[in-house]
Amino acid sequence: MSPAPSRPRIRPWLVVGDLALAAAWVCAGALVKLLVYGGLGLGGRPEAEAVKVSLSLVYMFLFAWLEAASGGASYNPLTVLAAALASHGGPAVYLFTAFARIPAQVIGAVLGVKLIQVTFPNVGKGARLSVGAHHGALAEGLATFMVVMVSVTLKKKEMKSFFMKTWITSIWKNTIHLLSSDITGGIMNPASAFAWAYARGDHTTFDHLLVYWLAPLQATLLGVWAVTFFTKPKKIKEQKVDENKIKKE
């Protein structure tokens, strides 16, 4: 008989890793834009997006490696929330994620934006909502749902190849980002969105909270639930059906 899987443990040191990676993530994204539009002078040219995607793939591989090397630190609140929900870690893990890890990521992202703005004053002000709040919430929520579905599915399948897993998720995230970039910026990261909004001074508006927090958080919950439901072993599904029949009788 195989041993029962161990329940996820609370690892306090991940808070430091979350803060550092969140700061580095916003800096990396801003530096890529500076290089493409400023250093290479590709602003407004078709090849600009191709170069951005190529550079994004490079640093997404780097951050995936950093996440693995740190034992699970992350730059995205949606990633740690999805992991906590999918692992069924219990109230302690959920509370640690909500009140320690996610705030650390937000603080890290804010510090990262401040650092990049001080170093490069012409870095810009981040992505903004270009449509109505409800339209934007639908777009950001749908984009998040699609990314979470793929990420959680790959994790549940326990794909051993780091390269293939990272390649699939990176290509998928970049595709969804491009499709939603003209609507909400395709951020799919509440910490990064908050950091840039904080720098602009519009981080407490209803539109920001709805589009970049409520919609993606709800989409994450729905995505984890959907993957968990559709990837349940057949025996468990049949057992639940039988139990329901017995109750009705």
Swiss-Prot record:
Motif (NPA 1): 76-78
Its membrane topology: Multi-pass membrane protein
Keywords attached to this entry: Membrane, Repeat, Transmembrane, Transmembrane helix, Transport
InterPro entries on file: Aquaporin-like (IPR023271), MIP (IPR000425), SIP2-1-like (IPR044226)
Keyword Oxidoreductase on entry: no
Residue ranges annotated as motif NPA 2: 189-191
Stretches that traverse the bilayer: 12-32, 53-73, 104-124, 133-155, 176-196, 210-230
Keyword Repeat found: yes
GO MF entries: channel activity
Any GO CC annotation of this UniProt entry: membrane
Compartments it resides in: Membrane
Domain notes: Aquaporins contain two tandem repeats each containing three membrane-spanning domains and a pore-forming loop with the signature motif Asn-Pro-Ala (NPA).
Functional description taken from the UniProt entry: Aquaporins facilitate the transport of water and small neutral solutes across cell membranes.
Sequence similarity: Belongs to the MIP/aquaporin (TC 1.A.8) family. SIP (TC 1.A.8.10) subfamily.
PANTHER family: AQUAPORIN SIP2-1-RELATED
Protein name per Swiss-Prot or TrEMBL: Aquaporin SIP2-1
Underlying gene: SIP2-1
